[in-house]
């Protein structure tokens, strides 16, 4: 696992964007696994800047998102499809037919999960998977527990996750309680994984991810078993690392 510590969130975002941009330039038909939440917003802004300045071409890129809330349509302003469109896809030349997010309104969630895994396999797997870190160690919506799912699955969100995401909604009561998430198996099959984290609130989980005991109670520790992980964090998130 490679570690890069940056001075602040802005620098972390720029370093992460540069890392992804270099992979896109090496492989214009790259399959990107993308994440949502507050942490990658700055990175996406930097990728948009690079595109606008002629440094990047997304026309042949395919993207697969980690997760989606159950019960929200793609045009709901708190859905992850909407997030991706407004924070990245609407501002670059990616073909939206090649951008995939789980269907939060699927009538048969089990079938949607199986179809999502099949789609990942059909496009040849993920070349670069971007991950943020939940304060409780979740990656995607793979929450701490006695066991972790291998494939894409329906998951009940932990109260800590609901509370963390409540800032995006009018009320905590509006936060969905379930989500469709790519499983640990799908994430671990990615050829390369890039993890980004910012702020003191992520320091404990960053320390655990780097050197803690591998346990399903902190899903991020599973990344220790992956052959190619780069962790990009700011100084606050790295404060507990020796």
UniProtKB/Swiss-Prot annotation:
List, alphabetically, the GO terms of the cellular component aspect.
Answer: cytoplasm
One of the GO BP terms on file? N-acetylneuraminate catabolic process
**One Pfam family here:** Glucosamine_iso
- Can you provide one Gene Ontology molecular function annotated for this UniProt record? identical protein binding
| Reactions the enzyme catalyzes | alpha-D-glucosamine 6-phosphate + H2O = beta-D-fructose 6-phosphate + NH4(+)
Q: Which NCBIfam families match?
A: nagB
State the function annotated in the UniProt record: Catalyzes the reversible isomerization-deamination of glucosamine 6-phosphate (GlcN6P) to form fructose 6-phosphate (Fru6P) and ammonium ion.
Which PANTHER family is this protein grouped with? Answer: GLUCOSAMINE-6-PHOSPHATE ISOMERASE
Which family does the record claim for this protein?
Answer: Belongs to the glucosamine/galactosamine-6-phosphate isomerase family. NagB subfamily.
Protein name as it appears in the record? Glucosamine-6-phosphate deaminase
Q: Which gene encodes it?
A: nagB
